[in-house]
């Protein structure tokens, strides 16, 4: 009978634990803990894909009528998310060249909720001026989201340089094969 009461407490969200494999399970929890440790973060959330991680991060911060400032050097799927998908939710994006710090500053609006970019843009390999971008975001009181798929925490840890949220597609370099 103890198991019944334990399950009841879990489903009523009265205590933490694994309820349903699609929500959480011990294996995914280990993955999340390891990615958080590699990044030097406090927590991580595993999703089905890197694109879903980006979408979830943006949708957590934004509502209809909001705006994001985005580096123009991004993976094509991410560009399409900001150009085609997010506008369907009423979220607008302004694209700025990764080294154009004045452009980032000018692009921030009253309804801007974050700055998003890749430290090293894929496919152009243009380096984002992260110290300046973080400074601009901090002055505006908005978070910086960095897609660090290309670097992995072995090469660069965005959180140590002022990023607030880091996303990855683990099927690229983090998984060790880089074949996706």
Where are these regions (language model features)?
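Conserved N-terminal alpha-helix of the aminotransferase class I/II PLP-enzyme fold
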Residues: 7-55, 77-85
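Conserved PLP-enzyme active-site core in the AAT-like
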Residues: 44-180
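Short, small-residue-biased leader/transition segments that mark boundaries at the very start
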Residues: 1-5
């Amino acid at each position: 009978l103890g198991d019944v009461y334990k399950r009841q407490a879990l489903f009523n969200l009265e205590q933490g634990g694994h309820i349903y494999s699609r929500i959480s399970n011990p294996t995914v929890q280990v993955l999340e803990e390891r990615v958080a440790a590699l990044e030097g973060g406090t927590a991580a959330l595993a999703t089905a894909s890197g694109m879903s991680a980006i979408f979830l991060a943006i949708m957590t911060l934004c509502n209809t009528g909001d705006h994001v400032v985005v580096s123009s050097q991004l993976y094509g799927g991410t560009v399409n998310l900001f150009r085609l998908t997010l506008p369907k939710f009423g979220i607008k994006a302004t694209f700025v060249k990764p080294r154009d710090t004045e452009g980032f500053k000018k692009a921030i609006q009253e309804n801007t909720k974050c700055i998003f970019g890749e430290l090293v843009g894929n496919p152009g390999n243009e380096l984002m001026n992260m110290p300046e971008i973080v400074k601009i975001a901090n002055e505006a009181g908005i978070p910086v989201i960095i897609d660090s798929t290309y670097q992995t925490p072995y090469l660069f840890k965005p959180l140590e340089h002022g990023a607030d949220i880091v996303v990855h597609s683990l099927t690229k370099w983090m998984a060790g094969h880089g074949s996706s």
